Amino acid sequence: MSLEILDQLEEKIKQAVETIQLLQLEVEELKEKNAESQRNIENLQTENEQLKNEHRNWQEHIRSLLGKFDNV
């Protein structure tokens, strides 16, 4: 009887170890996805800043042209 209980316990331990290993793999995948998402965020923030600067430059250029029209 106790041998049967030990066999059951061993099987449960094996299942628990397998579950832990699968969860560890899933955690690693999620960490990789998180890192990729973080890189994408940084790239988008950089692009956003560049576009804001470009927009500002165009606004200044248009103001300058409008100022020249006012002087004519």
UniProtKB/Swiss-Prot annotation:
GO CC, alphabetical: cytoplasm
UniProt GO BP: division septum assembly; FtsZ-dependent cytokinesis
The name this protein goes by in its record: Cell division protein ZapB
UniProt keyword list: Cell cycle, Cell division, Coiled coil, Cytoplasm, Septation
Main location: cytoplasm
Similarity comment text for this entry: Belongs to the ZapB family.
Gene field: zapB
Function: Non-essential, abundant cell division factor that is required for proper Z-ring formation. It is recruited early to the divisome by direct interaction with FtsZ, stimulating Z-ring assembly and thereby promoting cell division earlier in the cell cycle. Its recruitment to the Z-ring requires functional FtsA or ZipA.
Domain of life, source organism: Bacteria
Keyword Ribonucleoprotein appears in the UniProt entry: no
Signal peptide: none
Localization, UniProt: Cytoplasm
Organism of provenance: Haemophilus influenzae (strain ATCC 51907 / DSM 11121 / KW20 / Rd)
